[in-house]
Swiss-Prot record:
Coiled-coil blocks: none
Protein name as it appears in the record: UPF0145 protein Bamb_4477
Protein source organism: Burkholderia ambifaria (strain ATCC BAA-244 / DSM 16087 / CCUG 44356 / LMG 19182 / AMMD)
Family membership noted in the UniProt record: Belongs to the UPF0145 family.
Pfam families: YbjQ_1 (PF01906)
Length: 122
């Protein structure tokens, strides 16, 4: 049985890499760009709380939490998009973010959806 017969269910976070290839595997087919986009805004309460934290310096935990959640959601959406394309791995994964308005931020996670086969002896 080859990796392609299980390609949809095999795509797990462990098969996502920022490298241009997946160690121990050969890229058999490139399926195109997979992406996940999340647009988040700060709440008034969150902005007020974060504003208070800036008075004392250090890590602004409210914003850190918001950023971590947005990145995870974008990653999960990218995985879902790659699965739709039939991928069993994603290579060259990247994050990017842009402020598109006052307090509104877009986070995108993207990479190349691929089908890979395990190298002999790997």
């Amino acid at each position: 049985m080859n990796d392609f017969s299980r390609s949809i269910s095999d795509l797990t976070p462990e098969r996502v890499t920022t490298a241009f290839d997946l160690a121990g595997h050969t890229t058999a087919r490139s399926l195109g760009v997979a992406q996940g986009i999340v647009v988040r805004s700060r709440s008034i309460v969150g902005s007020f709380g974060a504003g208070l934290q800036t008075l004392f310096g250090g890590n602004i935990t409210l914003y850190t939490s918001l950023c971590e959640k947005a990145r995870q959601q974008a990653f999960d959406k990218m995985l879902a998009d790659a699965r739709k394309l039939g991928a069993n791995a994603v290579v060259a994964m990247r994050y990017d973010s842009t402020e598109i308005g006052s307090g509104i931020t877009e986070v995108i996670c993207y990479g190349t959806a691929v089908q890979v086969t395990r190298d002999a002896g790997a």
